[in-house]
Amino acid sequence: MTVRVGINGFGRIGRNFYRALLAQQEQGTADVEVVAANDITDNSTLAHLLKFDSILGRLPCDVGLEGDDTIVVGRAKIKALAVREGPAALPWGDLGVDVVVESTGLFTNAAKAKGHLDAGAKKVIISAPATDEDITIVLGVNDDKYDGSQNIISNASCTTNCLAPLAKVLDDEFGIVKGLMTTIHAYTQDQNLQDGPHKDLRRARAAALNIVPTSTGAAKAIGLVMPQLKGKLDGYALRVPIPTGSVTDLTVDLSTRASVDEINAAFKAAAEGRLKGILKYYDAPIVSSDIVTDPHSSIFDSGLTKVIDDQAKVVSWYDNEWGYSNRLVDLVTLVGKSL
């Protein structure tokens, strides 16, 4: 059955999700159709930003408008909505939408996201950490907990999707006692181009000119997908002046001592086995630009593994936009199978 999707919020994640879907459709791995997108931006601007992207380049198909309410992408047509009144006012039932990808960043708690269900959708996937959701899923880590009964689902954050596979391999193979992480993260639209007011006075500073320390909920969110690690991990983010391509540095105390070679071997086995497609293993001395448009959630850099006694440090890269958007497509596919 083709899963019919509505996108609420056609910004960076909404558009990246759609491009990732097109890529997976070409590979024959996604039986998903986007039937509508809701955004208060005018349609000509939405079509232009879908066609031309500073990171992903030009979309290799025609993008245009049909009438005043349809965006045409190749042979596909997307009903363009501009509903401001909130999720409950959207015509998902009339459009036969099965799953809504909620990517505005505004409706991340269950009470607000439930409006999509009231409007006729069967499931809601929130493209961010959420509050009071039915379940948070990190693919490859706890997707086996999805049983079809959960209706409001969080795809966690891009950083949690990178961190969780690292934590899973280390905890499964050696046991994690406790740990700290840092994500060196590309800037995002939540930061300022120039110095200006912001509730976070570090994010108030010019994103392209500074390394900006700030918070991340990724480490604490691990407890949502790996309950045995609740309260055992913490950390923060350093936002840096690049548009995409981030890296997570995780240092943990292990229950069982392991050498660098043993740790790397465990990650290589996981990348070739149970986490294939989620975790990637690299021997090469790569830098951030090398992983842009890589669809994996977590790209393990074996050359950066360090060990002192029972303490281990591992590093994994991730395209915080493209990798995450591909997991959104995968999660829509997973949820669609339960409909």
From Swiss-Prot:
Offer an example of a GO molecular function term for this protein.
Answer: glyceraldehyde-3-phosphate dehydrogenase (NAD+) (phosphorylating) activity
Q: Which GO terms describe its biological process?
A: glucose metabolic process; glycolytic process
Gene3D superfamilies, alphabetically? Dihydrodipicolinate Reductase, domain 2, NAD(P)-binding Rossmann-like Domain
Q: Does the keyword Oxidoreductase apply?
A: yes
Q: Which cysteines are joined by disulfide bonds?
A: none
* Pathway the protein takes part in: Carbohydrate degradation; glycolysis; pyruvate from D-glyceraldehyde 3-phosphate: step 1/5
Q: Which InterPro entries match?
A: GlycerAld/Erythrose_P_DH (IPR020831), GlycerAld_3-P_DH_AS (IPR020830), GlycerAld_3-P_DH_cat (IPR020829), GlycerAld_3-P_DH_NAD(P)-bd (IPR020828), Glyceraldehyde-3-P_DH_1 (IPR006424), NAD(P)-bd_dom_sf (IPR036291)
Q: Give the UniProt subcellular location, in the record's own words.
A: Cytoplasm
Q: Which CDD domains match?
A: GAPDH_I_C (cd18126), GAPDH_I_N (cd05214)
Per its UniProt entry, what is the enzyme's top EC class, as one word? oxidoreductase
Q: Where is the signal peptide?
A: none
* Summary of the function given for this chain in its UniProt record: Catalyzes the oxidative phosphorylation of glyceraldehyde 3-phosphate (G3P) to 1,3-bisphosphoglycerate (BPG) using the cofactor NAD. The first reaction step involves the formation of a hemiacetal intermediate between G3P and a cysteine residue, and this hemiacetal intermediate is then oxidized to a thioester, with concomitant reduction of NAD to NADH. The reduced NADH is then exchanged with the second NAD, and the thioester is attacked by a nucleophilic inorganic phosphate to produce BPG.
| Subunit text | Homotetramer.
What is the designated name of this protein?
Glyceraldehyde-3-phosphate dehydrogenase
Gene field: gap
